[in-house]
Amino acid sequence: MDLISSLSLGELALSFSRVPLFPVFDLSYFIVSIIYLKYEPGSVELSRRHPVASWLCAMLHCFGSYILADLLLGEPIIDYFSNSSSILLASGVWYLIFFCPLDLFYKCVCFLPVKLIFVAMKEVVRVRKIAVGIHHAHHYHHGWFIMIATGWVKGSGVALLSNLEQLLRGVWKPETNEILHMSFPTKASLYGAILFTLQQTRWLPVSKASLIFVFTMFMVSCKVFLTATHSHSSPFDVLEGYICPVLFGATWGGDHHHDNHGAPHGMGLGTQHSGLPAKAKEELSEGFRKKKTKKAD
């Protein structure tokens, strides 16, 4: 961190950490969150037939992280809805994205250069929420796992509540559980929560402002690049590909191997036979024909 101080980035990081999020950054967060809601199949039809359900889904996309964090900490889960300004702002964004004539607002905010700006600003909010979540749970003192869990859900609570949001839309897809298939923001929020927990407990000799600045730059760079290239990959995939076999004794992409074990018995037998040499296959086939002939006799 001496390098950061010598480059006068310490003051920049401190000033950056004090920038208020409301209303500009929160507005960007709401816009991107509700855009992703509109991407979901059937969401437009839902907004026409059941606008209340669509509005609830939008509020869950915007404030799901606060709801889940309050649930973990035993606080009222509707406490954040007392913030009328944020609720009205998010509701206005929802209405414009779904009901603006000719979809003008939606087309404007989805224009890629504009969308990239909103995506970058959303990541600023995400990192700040992770840091606030760690600080919020710091009264547990040595409860590291509680602090990490709180920071994690603050950063990715919307994704972790995706199954609940699907139920509000009348859809049930348990195979899309975010725990089973973590996206880049969910993984990054988890790793970020670990870093901020180490900083909060003084195991990481870095100021909170500097950590917020550095991690925000990382998140903004990665997310903007992934959005611009329309990629669903994760920058962590390469690192996890090397670490997972060492720590967990499984090759990367081991789910496919597991799926083979879960195949029907007939399919498993066919798979076993397909792995045999050609001569062994012929012997098995010949033996099967002889056995069938004896039964016929």
Curated annotation (Swiss-Prot):
A 1,2-diacyl-sn-glycero-3-phospho-(1D-myo-inositol-4,5-bisphosphate) binds at K122, R126. Residues 259-297 are annotated as: Disordered. InterPro entries: TRIC_channel. Residues 279-288 have a biased composition (Basic and acidic residues). The keyword Plastid does not apply. Ca(2+) binds at G74. GO terms for molecular function: identical protein binding; metal ion binding; potassium channel activity. Coiled coil: none annotated. Channel activity is activated by a change of voltage within the sarcoplasmic reticulum lumen and blocked by luminal high Ca(2+) levels. Pfam families: TRIC. One of its GO terms (biological process) is regulation of release of sequestered calcium ion into cytosol. It is found in: Sarcoplasmic reticulum membrane; Nucleus membrane. The chain crosses the membrane at residues 19-39, 52-72, 86-106, 144-164, 178-198, 209-229, 234-254. Residues 1-18, 73-85, 165-177, 230-233 are lumenal. The keyword S-adenosyl-L-methionine does not apply. Keywords: Calcium, Ion channel, Ion transport, Membrane, Metal-binding, Nucleus, Potassium, Potassium channel, Potassium transport, Sarcoplasmic reticulum, Transmembrane, Transmembrane helix, Transport. It is a multi-pass membrane protein. Residues 40-51, 107-143, 199-208, 255-297 are cytoplasmic. It comes from the Eukaryota. GO terms for cellular component: nuclear membrane; sarcoplasmic reticulum; sarcoplasmic reticulum membrane. Its main location: membrane. It catalyses: K(+)(in) = K(+)(out). Homotrimer; conformation seems to be controled by binding to diacylglycerol (DAG). Belongs to the TMEM38 family. Intracellular monovalent cation channel required for maintenance of rapid intracellular calcium release. Acts as a potassium counter-ion channel that functions in synchronization with calcium release from intracellular stores. Opened by a change of voltage within the sarcoplasmic reticulum lumen. This is Trimeric intracellular cation channel type A. It comes from Rattus norvegicus.
